[in-house]
Amino acid sequence: MAIERTFSMIKPDATKRNLTGAITKMLEDAGLRVVASKRVWMSRREAEGFYAVHKERPFFGELVEFMSSGPTIVQVLEGENAIAKNREVMGATNPANADEGTIRKVHALSIGENSVHGSDGPETAAEEIAYWFAGTEIVG
């Protein structure tokens, strides 16, 4: 199995409820290792840039508003098949459809306030990691 890195974010709805430790523990218990982490409060410009792929979607404005409404934890996770494992631990985007024991089933409030974000593939992971971290900030 290949060791890979992925991007993970704990969203404002979760940080406001002091769930950072609980969510990080779920990720680590699944075999993922945090190799970079920082707490940021996204500006509107940063949120627009990070979610630019959704710019033409009807929910874009609401997404930007939400993501700039409070602190987030941006982090790089490392482990065997880290991208797939992170997505499995997060659960379905809609918490109503998420498997029992996943982050979103346990902690999400709604499809919009679903507590976490994770990269969906290797290219996206590389882009999202580079958006928030310099290479020297990632310590494996």
From Swiss-Prot:
Q: Known EC number(s)?
A: 2.7.4.6
Q: Which GO terms describe its cellular component?
A: cytoplasm
One function term, GO molecular function aspect: metal ion binding
Q: Where in the cell is it found?
A: Cytoplasm
What is the top-level taxon of the source organism?
Bacteria
List the active-site residues. 117 (pros-phosphohistidine intermediate)
Q: Which cofactor does it need?
A: Mg(2+)
InterPro entries linked to this entry: NDK-like_dom, NDK-like_dom_sf, Nucleoside_diP_kinase, Nucleoside_diP_kinase_AS
Q: Give any single GO term for biological process.
A: GTP biosynthetic process
Q: Where does ATP bind?
A: 11, 59, 87, 93, 104, 114
Q: Which reaction does it catalyse?
A: a 2'-deoxyribonucleoside 5'-diphosphate + ATP = a 2'-deoxyribonucleoside 5'-triphosphate + ADP; a ribonucleoside 5'-diphosphate + ATP = a ribonucleoside 5'-triphosphate + ADP
Q: Does the keyword Ion transport apply?
A: no
EC class = transferase
- Name the CDD domains on file: NDPk_I (cd04413)
What keywords would UniProt list here? Answer: ATP-binding, Cytoplasm, Kinase, Magnesium, Metal-binding, Nucleotide metabolism, Nucleotide-binding, Phosphoprotein, Transferase
Q: Does the keyword Glycoprotein apply?
A: no
Q: Which NCBIfam families match?
A: PRK00668.1
Q: Cite the PANTHER family for this sequence.
A: NUCLEOSIDE DIPHOSPHATE KINASE
Q: Which family does it belong to?
A: Belongs to the NDK family.
Summarizing the function annotation, the protein's role is: Major role in the synthesis of nucleoside triphosphates other than ATP. The ATP gamma phosphate is transferred to the NDP beta phosphate via a ping-pong mechanism, using a phosphorylated active-site intermediate.
How is the subunit organization of this protein annotated in UniProt?
Homotetramer.
Please state what the protein is called: Nucleoside diphosphate kinase
Task: Report the source organism.
Answer: Sinorhizobium fredii (strain NBRC 101917 / NGR234)
Name of the gene encoding the protein in the UniProt record: ndk
